[in-house]
Swiss-Prot record:
It holds the Pfam family DUF494. The lineage of its organism: Bacteria, Pseudomonadati, Pseudomonadota, Betaproteobacteria, Nitrosomonadales. HAMAP family: Smg (MF_00598). This is Protein Smg homolog. Belongs to the Smg family. It comes from the Bacteria.
Amino acid sequence: MFDILVYLFENYFDAGNCPDSATLTRKLTMAGFDDEEITLALDWLSDLSRHDEEGYLAGLAESDSMRHFTEEEMEIIDTEGRGFIFFLEQAGVINPLQRELLIDRVIRMDGDTASIEKIKLVVLFDLWIQNQLTDRSIVEGLFVVSDSHQRH
């Protein structure tokens, strides 16, 4: 699924909008992706675009409380990934509600663990869907800032 999401971002970011699901399925199949993986990726994207905030407290977006990860979350999201999520929140890229949605979406991705690259991709897709990514410089800035953060 990760490879499909990377492919979609690389091919449709500049276009502004992705084609409809049927067109995407056809194009992804022609690109050589497996039908089951395509379905998983498109379902995941559909969930992402819904911004399902019903399971979260209404005031969470304004919260300044400290987040502690559960044992399950720590098994999937390593120290580097958790640090990156914390960094994004502290830098004002995401708010606490977006952080919770991000963690939920990362947990739902395929694979046993979530690499920093997967977390970055989820953030990029989320910001893209919310129209908070207006140009490529923001994308590049996110990666440059996060890379310099990782060196400290």
